[in-house]
Regions:
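Non-heme Fe(II)/2-oxoglutarate
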Residues: 1-83
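Catalytic core of non-heme Fe(II) oxygenases with the double-stranded beta-helix
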Residues: 75-172
Length: 172
């Protein structure tokens, strides 16, 4: 992991609506395929739907819009932190009303994480142990070191909160 300048790195960037729309279109199309989702009881997700690693799911591997969106997101992050990265894990989380994410981090698998908000909703703020709180707003993307403990507050909207979560490793 990069030390010094990027310790406790956290950025909130807006991405183009076209990228977000391509991602949400794919999720909405493929989430009904039970091969693409997992049982959330072994995760930090409560009252929601979660995909398996989309990098390993045929529906997502073969979707050129999704792959293009992933490439665009990776370029944005690499430009932001000035480091070459590659994806290790990519998954979707959709929270129902009352759904939330327990405090966790991604340090066991990744160097950097991103959360792309696929829609705007009430509640469901991403919160960090440092006290930083980010409200879900469509097209906003959080980029942070995987060591940062974070969670998602309870979703209070009738519209499900939808996010894309990506884990990246530094390319050697």
């Amino acid at each position: 992991m990069v030390k010094g300048l990027y310790d406790n790195f956290l950025a909130n960037v807006e991405v183009s609506e076209a990228i977000t729309d391509n991602v949400i279109e794919c999720w909405d199309k493929y989430k009904t395929n039970s091969d693409n989702t997992i049982d959330v009881t072994s995760t930090s997700t409560f009252d929601g739907l979660q995909s398996a690693n989309a990098l390993e799911l045929l529906d997502f591997q073969e979707d050129y819009k999704f792959q293009g969106a992933l490439n665009n997101l990776l370029e944005i992050v690499q430009h932001l932190i000035r480091t070459n990265l590659h994806y290790y894990w990519v998954h979707f989380v959709e929270y129902h009303s009352g759904g939330y994410q327990g405090i966790h981090n991604h340090a066991h698998n990744e160097d950097y994480s991103l959360i792309l908000y696929l829609n705007t909703c009430k509640g469901g703020q991403t919160h960090f142990e440092s006290g930083v709180v980010c409200t879900p707003k469509k097209n906003n993307m959080l980029v942070f070191q995987a060591t940062l403990n974070h969670g998602a507050k309870e979703t209070q909207s009738w519209d499900n909160k939808k996010v894309l979560v990506c884990g990246m490793r530094i390319s050697k």
